[in-house]
């Protein structure tokens, strides 16, 4: 029994990062600590071994074969960030919209890897829009992991920047929680609503809670309300112990008229409208000011 237990620990340790990736769900008690439902195709894709993958496909392995929890070889290639392997699988008919037991799509997995070329490839074979019934959002995952290029790609394909997931919040809120400064800036510039977070908890609440001074400063520059209260009646100032953030919140002065106008125009235009500002025939300097260039 001890031998079996030890062997199980080896397997769990080896694939621990994948349990984290897909939520750690086990479809059957018989499969606990085992990967017997995986095929050599899955292993080759995960490890980025192009030649073995090509050989297995030529031998007739089913490109769409999924494990009990719905993981396909394409998911594996995307998790590993292996562009050429994913391209080969797609050329052989892999389903770019396949969904795992935990709701992860190949696009979600590609965003986890942070490979923008791979994300772009998957987007040519699938929709960028996130199904309402899935909790695994590619945009949120890219934002949480600091993959700015992936965030930009998704938004350029029309993904809703202010999509709020239950108990998770918006992508901006997630980026503030992990202090991903570049992603926070990118999301704000590309039209994220600075007040949309998780329920009444705003991105500024999140940034102050985790001591994100740079994030808090960016949020204030884009019009965040430092007096807003969450469901517990707390303001961002109430949630921080960071002295630099406290100083920032307490000394923030009255905004200039030009700033107020910029925020008002940006909110009126929204995410889609910001992409069409060139049609407004504004002076070059004013156009750049509006877009924070």
Swiss-Prot record:
Tissues/organs with expression: Expressed in the developing nervous system: localizes to neural plate margins and is abutting the proneuronal zone.
Coiled coil: none
Gene Ontology MF term list: ubiquitin-like ligase-substrate adaptor activity
Disruption phenotype: Morpholino knockdown of the protein causes a reduction in specific Delta-Notch signaling.
SUPFAM superfamilies on file: Ankyrin repeat (SSF48403), SOCS box-like (SSF158235)
Limits of the SOCS box domain: 244-293
Record bears the keyword Endoplasmic reticulum: yes
Keyword annotations of the record: ANK repeat, Endoplasmic reticulum, Repeat, Ubl conjugation pathway
Biological pathway: Protein modification; protein ubiquitination
Main location: endoplasmic reticulum
Placement of ANK repeats on the sequence: 36-65, 69-98, 102-131, 134-163, 167-196, 199-228, 232-259
Domain of life of the organism encoding this protein: Eukaryota
Keyword Endoplasmic reticulum: yes
InterPro entries: Ankyrin-SOCS_box_domain, Ankyrin_rpt, Ankyrin_rpt-contain_sf, SOCS_box, SOCS_box-like_dom_sf
Protein's GO biological process: endoplasmic reticulum unfolded protein response; negative regulation of neuron differentiation; positive regulation of Notch signaling pathway; positive regulation of protein catabolic process; positive regulation of transcription of Notch receptor target; proteasome-mediated ubiquitin-dependent protein catabolic process; protein K11-linked ubiquitination; protein ubiquitination
Subcellular location: Endoplasmic reticulum
GO CC terms, sorted: Cul5-RING ubiquitin ligase complex; endoplasmic reticulum
Similarity remark: Belongs to the ankyrin SOCS box (ASB) family.
Function: Substrate-recognition component of a cullin-5-RING E3 ubiquitin-protein ligase complex (ECS complex, also named CRL5 complex), which mediates the ubiquitination and subsequent proteasomal degradation of target proteins. Acts as a regulator of the neuronal progenitor compartment size by maintaining the neural precursors in the proliferating undifferentiated state. The ECS(ASB11) complex acts as a positive regulator of Notch signaling pathway by mediating ubiquitination and degradation of DeltaA (dla). Also acts as a regulator of regenerative myogenesis.
Subunit structure: substrate-recognition component of the ECS(ASB11) complex, composed of asb11, cul5, elob, eloc and rnf7/rbx2.
Protein name as catalogued: Ankyrin repeat and SOCS box protein 11
Organism name: Danio rerio (Zebrafish)
Origin organism lineage: Eukaryota, Metazoa, Chordata, Craniata, Vertebrata
Gene: asb11
């Amino acid at each position: 029994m001890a031998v079996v237990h030890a062997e199980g620990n080896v397997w769990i340790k080896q694939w621990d990062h994948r349990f984290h990736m897909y939520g750690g769900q086990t479809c059957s008690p018989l499969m606990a600590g085992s990967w017997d439902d995986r095929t050599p195709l899955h292993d080759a894709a995960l490890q980025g071994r192009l030649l073995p993958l090509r050989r297995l496909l030529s031998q007739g392995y089913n490109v769409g074969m999924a494990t009990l929890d719905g993981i396909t070889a394409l998911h594996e290639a995307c998790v590993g960030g292996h562009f050429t392997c994913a391209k080969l699988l797609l050329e052989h008919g892999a389903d770019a919209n396949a969904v795992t037991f935990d709701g992860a799509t190949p696009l979600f997995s590609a965003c986890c890897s942070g490979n923008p070329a791979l994300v772009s490839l998957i987007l040519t074979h699938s929709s960028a829009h996130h199904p309402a019934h899935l909790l695994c959002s590619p945009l949120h995952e890219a934002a949480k992991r600091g993959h700015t290029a992936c965030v930009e790609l998704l938004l350029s394909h029309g993904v809703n920047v202010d999509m709020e997931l239950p108990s998770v919040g918006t992508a901006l809120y997630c980026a503030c929680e992990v202090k991903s400064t570049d992603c926070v800036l990118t999301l704000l510039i590309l039209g994220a609503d600075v007040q949309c977070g998780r329920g009444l908890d705003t991105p500024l609440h999140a940034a102050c809670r985790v001591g994100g001074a740079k994030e808090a400063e960016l949020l204030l520059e884009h019009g965040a309300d430092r007096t807003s209260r969450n469901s517990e009646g707390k303001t961002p100032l109430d949630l921080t112990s960071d002295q630099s953030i406290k100083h920032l919140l307490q000394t923030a002065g009255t905004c200039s008229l030009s700033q107020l106008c910029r925020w008002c125009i940006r909110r009126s235009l929204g995410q889609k409208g910001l992409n069409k500002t060139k049609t407004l025939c504004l002076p070059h300097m004013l156009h750049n000011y509006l877009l924070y260039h």
